[in-house]
């Protein structure tokens, strides 16, 4: 099973980006989404350092709400 974490793009430099979620920033590769138009402020799913899918802000928020609920009951 794979887990992808939704993050918001805060900086783009070619195929590299800085993404943020829950106060944590990470450098990620946009290489796998090179055919997708991406801008600062967009949300993407991150898996092992790669953005693998663009998602809406609502989808990202829903995922984090689910993660928070799971952690609350862990």
Which sequence ranges carry the predicted segments?
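Beta-strand/loop nucleic-acid-binding surfaces
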Residues: 25-35
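Conserved hydrophobic positions within beta-strands
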Residues: 6-9
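Anionic group-transfer/hydrolysis microenvironments
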Residues: 22, 31, 49
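C-terminal structural segments of small proteins and small subunits
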Residues: 43-74
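Short nucleic-acid-contacting surface segments enriched for D/E, G, S/T with interspersed K/R
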Residues: 34-45
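SH3/SH3-like beta-barrel fold
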Residues: 17-21
